[in-house]
Amino acid sequence: VIALLLIVTISIGYAALSTTLNINGTSTIKTQNWDVHFANVKATTTTGATVTKAPTITEGKTTEVTYNVALNQPGSVYEFTVDVVNGGTIAAKTSAIPTLGGNTQPTIFNYTVTWSDGSPITANTALAAGDKKTVKVRIEYKKDITAAQLPSADTALSLTCSIPYVQA
């Protein structure tokens, strides 16, 4: 009986000395959108080049620019700029340097993609929500090549450039 009274007393004492803490609240997730795209394509330099398709943003695909030019002789240059626009609400940044691809034939041809001031596009370059940066694309038939380096037939070059963006 004493043991039973002792257990009941300890149980009541424990119950009297215990409590439950609760945390209650609400959180609202605001609407956000991701919208990094191209806008405002402008040809800036055409020297000795024939433009068969001016650079344009692909309809329905604002993350792609296409163009078609013929560089007619050594020293020919074609250059255009395009804005990279962050029309979303989330800050973005480049995740890597641009990847240039295609059969660029570097002995006779230069293909560069830089910021409009000529500085290289590097990883971790920020693009704030609502901001834009201008990219310059330049293709050039080198003028300081030898006769042996000249192509013996028209050569189509398929050029690509990818600039990866991620959330900052």
Protein language model regions, located:
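Terminal low-complexity, poorly structured segments
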Residues: V1-I2, A96, A123
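C-terminal, structured domain-capping segment
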Residues: N72-G101, A129-A168
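Intrinsic-disorder/low-complexity loop/linker signature
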Residues: T46-A49, G60-K61, G102-T104, W115-S119, ...
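Beta-strand-rich interaction surfaces with strong enrichment in secreted/lumenal proteins
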Residues: T66-A70, I121-L127
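Strand-loop-strand motifs at the edges of beta-sheets in extracellular beta-sandwich domains
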Residues: Y111-T114, S119-I121, T125, K133-R138
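Short, polar/proline-rich extracytoplasmic segments that appear immediately after membrane translocation
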Residues: V1-T63, A153-L157, V166-A168
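Surface-exposed interaction patch
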Residues: V8-I12, A16-L21, W34-A39, T66-W115
